[in-house]
């Protein structure tokens, strides 16, 4: 009855497998010697192993003739090995440079971390050991790719650099609170006349009105009998009291410009 699962598998193309090789495989796989399944004369299997896919933890192949370790047999070892499983191949040093040929076959078979060890002085018959590992992912598996995050460049500040205090750039005048002009400080009564020491601008406004010979009512609520007074000087008659003033809308206060009393020359 064919086995389906094994912690470790030892195969050889010879009639018997040295007990020492079985012990080495058990130690490398971290299992007891009794858990190692041994198959001899593997060349008679036709390149097939009686195990399910990904059912063997580790494989030790003791091969006397390199030609018995063909590409088909390498593929079969990869099939029965679990993902991340280890394979050890021991070969006779009598073959001409067998380790290079075996390493190439393992690499072409999809194994990684292929390494060849030095010859063992304790066992001259099987002395060249090549170790490899099956990839840890299965065929058809997928995994998300992590997008690289671009961080902002870090500014290196030299401790010896002299830093300027922003407050030291301000003068005493800059730190003083500005004095706002007093609005409407005239003690006006019902006539709303500017006081003697007017500082709110009412005296200047009254001076402009007196210059025009207009009443406050005509400034604050201008009206036009002909309908052209508010259109500007181009439409006003020669006796219009609003000549020289800007255009306005009837009923809206006339806004006198600040330079109204300034001389043209």
From Swiss-Prot:
Q: Where is this region: Fe-S binding site A?
A: 186-200
Main subcellular localisation: cytoplasm
The record's annotation in Gene3D superfamilies points to:
Vaccinia Virus protein VP39
* Keywords from the UniProt entry: 2Fe-2S, 4Fe-4S, Cytoplasm, Iron, Iron-sulfur, Metal-binding, Mitochondrion
Q: Name one GO biological process term.
A: iron-sulfur cluster assembly
Q: Where is this region: Linker?
A: 144-175
For the ligand ([2Fe-2S] cluster), the binding residues are 186, 195, 198, 200
What InterPro entries has UniProt attached to this entry? Anamorsin, CIAPIN1, SAM-dependent_MTases_sf
GO cellular component, as recorded: cytoplasm; mitochondrial intermembrane space
Where in this protein does the record put region N-terminal SAM-like domain?
1-143
Residues given in the record as [4Fe-4S] cluster binding sites: 226, 229, 237, 240
The subcellular localization recorded is:
Cytoplasm; Mitochondrion intermembrane space
Q: Which residues form a coiled coil?
A: none
Q: Where is this region: Fe-S binding site B?
A: 226-240
Q: Where is this motif: Cx2C motif 2?
A: 237-240
List, in alphabetical order, the Gene Ontology terms for molecular function in this entry. 2 iron, 2 sulfur cluster binding; 4 iron, 4 sulfur cluster binding; electron transfer activity; metal ion binding
Transmembrane segments annotated in the record for this chain: none
Q: List the cofactors.
A: [2Fe-2S] cluster; [4Fe-4S] cluster
Q: How does this protein assemble?
A: Monomer.
Tell me which family the UniProt entry assigns to this protein: Belongs to the anamorsin family.
- Function in brief: Component of the cytosolic iron-sulfur (Fe-S) protein assembly (CIA) machinery. Required for the maturation of extramitochondrial Fe-S proteins. Part of an electron transfer chain functioning in an early step of cytosolic Fe-S biogenesis, facilitating the de novo assembly of a [4Fe-4S] cluster on the cytosolic Fe-S scaffold complex. Electrons are transferred from NADPH via a FAD- and FMN-containing diflavin oxidoreductase.
Q: Could you give the domain comment from the record?
A: The C-terminal domain binds 2 Fe-S clusters but is otherwise mostly in an intrinsically disordered conformation. The N-terminal domain has structural similarity with S-adenosyl-L-methionine-dependent methyltransferases, but does not bind S-adenosyl-L-methionine. It is required for correct assembly of the 2 Fe-S clusters.
Protein name per its UniProtKB record: Anamorsin homolog 1
Q: Which organism is it from?
A: Oryza sativa subsp. japonica (Rice)
Give the classification, highest ranks.
Eukaryota, Viridiplantae, Streptophyta, Embryophyta, Tracheophyta
